[in-house]
Amino acid sequence: MCIRDRFYDIANQVKPKADQHIDWNRSHLHIASAYTPEAVQYAKDYFKNGIDFLLDDGPHTLDSMIDCVKLYAPLMNQGGVLMIEDVQSKDWFQQLSAVAPSGVLFEAIDLTASGRYDDLIAVYQF
């Protein structure tokens, strides 16, 4: 097997399948490193009325997850939800809970009964 066979061609394989399920009149896809000041400023400028839902599927490191909460919590709308998937250890929930802004409900979701180690999700309800 050639190494290139292990990579997806986003434009020709993934996007056409996504197009079948996504209403692009109501959805926007932005691909970038979310953990830079430029990305946060872009999000702030683009989502002038705030963010209702944010899903972090980043590098899967504890530091990046904490950064996500610290960087994007100020942009979240009241009633909004910020989810971080693929939390790598149940032990991380304590630190992820500790960075929840005041008044924000934190929920640790453990779906590891499915047999997959990475089915841990941190949810912040604003």
Residue ranges of predicted features:
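Short, conserved SAM-binding/catalytic segment
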Residues: V14-S27
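C-terminal substrate-binding/active-site "lid" region of AdoMet-derived donor-dependent transferases
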Residues: L62-F126
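The conserved SAM/SAH-binding core of class I Rossmann-like methyltransferase domains
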Residues: Y8
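Short, small-residue-biased leader/transition segments that mark boundaries at the very start
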Residues: M1-I3
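Conserved SAM/SAH-binding beta-strand->alpha-helix loop
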Residues: A11
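Active-site segment flanking the S-adenosylmethionine/decSAM binding pocket
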Residues: S27-D91
